Amino acid sequence: PRTYYAAMATGGVWKSVDGGVSWAPIFDDQPTTSIGAIAVAPSDPNVVYVGSGEANIRGNVAPGLGIFKSTDAGKTWAHVWKQTGQIGTMVVHPRNADIAFAAVLGHAFGPNPERGVYRTTDGGKTWQQVLKKDADTGASDVALDPSNPLVVFAGLWQARRQPWGLTSGGPGSGLYVSRDGGDTWTQLTGHGLPDGPWGQVGVAVRRSRGRRVYALAEA
């Protein structure tokens, strides 16, 4: 509980082993310093996934180079998915460190087909795009139900960055759920959720009570 990792927008990955009193850089030998997400496997704290490319898409946002993985708590890294763009969230299965999801926002300044939610079931050797809307819509968040990891929630965000501004929102944005581990997805509407169009979407599942889900929607 005294070990922490921190992702920096342009400063790589840092680690503390004394509860945050001191920090050391552990990613400086890698080809990118723009970090969007860190996920530590609950079943094996030596397994750490890093999604590069921060998803706060300001005018001078730095693109990432895909996904990196460590199996020795950050001492060494493998470049397991090579794509440019932004990754905002990663999450690891609570009992299987080989299963992980990535919310890929993609390139901030234009349409690109790699946007969406990706899943690996073999420890990062291969990644499958399991949720995709269109080339203008990326994934802004992904969350697992810790008590039932077959239940996965994801937020999609239709967004386009220009040097002078940001276009956020449109028919592509929405909140989705999968009840079979990411194989199939259903968009959630109504029942208290605001009418569209939406912008950026965030989602979280309460750890102690998986049926309680929190969603934050720009609407």
Predicted feature locations:
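Beta-propeller blade termini and top-face loops
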Residues: 1-219
